[in-house]
């Protein structure tokens, strides 16, 4: 679990997301409150429930990007889902309970990786011994049983030294490794994913733990043996329990496109993929117990962050019970020309840096001038205003169009430097930006 302070979290998000300070602060406080809650005594800790967040803002301003970056910072079970993928219980489609099942699966993977990393040193020792057993088989007595030697032989010690120094890396050995589990692909209708995974695990267990002799270079065998030995040192039951605890205490669910499940106007008949989904989300957000293949999971202390553009619907179109369970509202602002300029230059791996690196692989040096950056930002903003406003995503479209000619001829331009200034941008984009019909279809 992350122990970063809110200021540190915001600072980390600033490296990738421009503006939207209110949203960053709310998310940072929510994440820090998870840590604060764990410092309380058990009785009070049980009473403190997370304050769920609803992020409202037009498309392309950073809602989903905040979720992506938060997943890396949280160091806790995290899952991002699209609200539009779910239907009401009893109809064809995914049930909302599958969110918690997927979150638990993610937690099991995360906890397994942590447990393997914790046992890595011991696993390396065991893997080393197995390789030495192949290189210098231990002495056997008259009954064919391996004798336990008090002291390793001089030859074994010499080989151990060579192995650690990497002198034997390219030597081939034949070694017994655990055979890969039997792979069974099962096609199931939507909504039956849980049954499919249970059947697959059942078929895999039928195969048992078979050993298979393989001929490998020592450096490759070492990697596989370390994984195998580390997996043996992990207790599966303990791992499942740790994963369930991690989900219940630190789990975070990000629900995107929640505005798409708002009811629009009066309609007769069941609304299975809109209001029905909202009703099914209520118990999850409020707190209930969900059955997963790893055990029962309580959702009382899972943090839910929902986001939506709300261009057609309004937050008040959500059913009142769900509105009440998303108490913190954060509005994200539409992006301006100056925001676009910052997006093109400030993030760690901004789009311009990516294009420079891509063209450098062909030996072409690309230079973006300040005037060029400003003109690209103005063109993107202008197209957003005259057609549909898709936020920062418009920059990808504009830049791809601008770089199309260079990308096509890159192999012939090796060794050259191309300067992209305001004149270059105007020459390639002005006609498209000015013609609304063209920009509607091309940009």
Swiss-Prot record:
ATP binds at residues 18, 60-65, 256, 321, 393. Signal peptide: none annotated. GO terms for cellular component: HslUV protease complex. It is found in: Cytoplasm. The keyword ATP-binding applies. SMART domains: AAA (SM00382), ClpB_D2-small (SM01086). Keywords: ATP-binding, Chaperone, Cytoplasm, Nucleotide-binding, Stress response. Induction: By heat shock. GO terms for biological process: protein unfolding; proteolysis involved in protein catabolic process. The keyword Nucleotide-binding applies. It holds the Pfam family AAA_2. Belongs to the ClpX chaperone family. HslU subfamily. ATPase subunit of a proteasome-like degradation complex; this subunit has chaperone activity. The binding of ATP and its subsequent hydrolysis by HslU are essential for unfolding of protein substrates subsequently hydrolyzed by HslV. HslU recognizes the N-terminal part of its protein substrates and unfolds these before they are guided to HslV for hydrolysis. HAMAP family: HslU. PANTHER family: ATP-DEPENDENT CLP PROTEASE ATP-BINDING SUBUNIT CLPX-LIKE, MITOCHONDRIAL-RELATED, ATP-DEPENDENT PROTEASE ATPASE SUBUNIT HSLU. This is ATP-dependent protease ATPase subunit HslU. The gene is hslU.
């Amino acid at each position: 679990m992350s122990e970063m302070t809110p200021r540190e979290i915001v600072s980390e998000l600033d490296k990738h997301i421009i503006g939207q300070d209110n949203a960053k602060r709310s998310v940072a406080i929510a994440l820090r409150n998870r840590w604060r809650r764990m410092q309380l005594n058990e009785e009070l800790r049980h009473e403190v429930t997370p304050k769920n967040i609803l992020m409202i803002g037009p498309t392309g301003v950073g809602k989903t990007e905040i979720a992506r970056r938060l997943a890396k910072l949280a160091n806790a079970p995290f899952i991002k889902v699209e609200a539009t993928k779910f239907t009401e219980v009893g109809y064809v489609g995914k049930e909302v309970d599958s969110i918690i099942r997927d979150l638990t699966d993610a937690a099991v993977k995360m906890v397994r990786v942590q447990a393997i990393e914790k046992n890595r040193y011991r696993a390396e020792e065991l893997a080393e011994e197995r390789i030495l057993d192949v290189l210098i088989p231990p002495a056997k007595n008259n009954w064919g049983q391996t004798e336990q030697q008090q002291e390793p032989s001089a030859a074994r010690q010499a080989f151990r030294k060579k192995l650690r120094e990497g002198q034997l890396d390219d030597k081939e050995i034949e070694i017994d490794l655990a055979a890969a589990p039997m792979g069974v692909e099962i096609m199931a209708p939507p909504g039956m994913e849980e049954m499919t995974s249970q059947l697959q695990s059942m078929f895999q267990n039928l195969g048992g733990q078979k050993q298979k002799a393989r001929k490998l270079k020592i450096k490759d065998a070492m990697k596989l043996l370390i994984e195998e030995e580390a997996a043996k040192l992990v207790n599966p039951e303990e791992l499942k329990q740790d994963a369930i605890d991690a989900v219940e205490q630190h789990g975070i669910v990000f629900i995107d496109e929640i505005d798409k499940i708002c009811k629009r106007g009066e309609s007769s008949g069941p609304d299975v993929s809109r209001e029905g989904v909202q009703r099914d989300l209520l118990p999850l957000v409020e707190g209930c117990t969900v059955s997963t293949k790893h055990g029962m999971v309580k959702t009382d202390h899972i943090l839910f962050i929902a986001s939506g553009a709300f261009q057609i619907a309004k937050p008040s179109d959500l059913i009142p019970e769900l509105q009440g369970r998303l108490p913190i509202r954060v509005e994200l602002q539409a992006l301006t020309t100056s925001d676009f300029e910052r997006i093109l230059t400030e993030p760690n791996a901004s789009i311009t840096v990516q294009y420079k690196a891509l063209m450098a692989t062909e030996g072409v040096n690309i230079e973006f001038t300040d005037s060029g950056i400003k003109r690209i930002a103005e063109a993107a903003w202008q197209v957003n205003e005259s057609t549909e406003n898709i936020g920062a995503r418009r920059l990808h479209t504009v830049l791809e169009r601008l770089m199309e000619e260079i990308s096509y001829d890159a192999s012939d331009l090796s060794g050259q430097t191309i300067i992209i200034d305001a004149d270059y941008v105007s020459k390639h984009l002005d006609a498209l930006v000015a013609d609304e019909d063209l920009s509607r279809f091309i940009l």
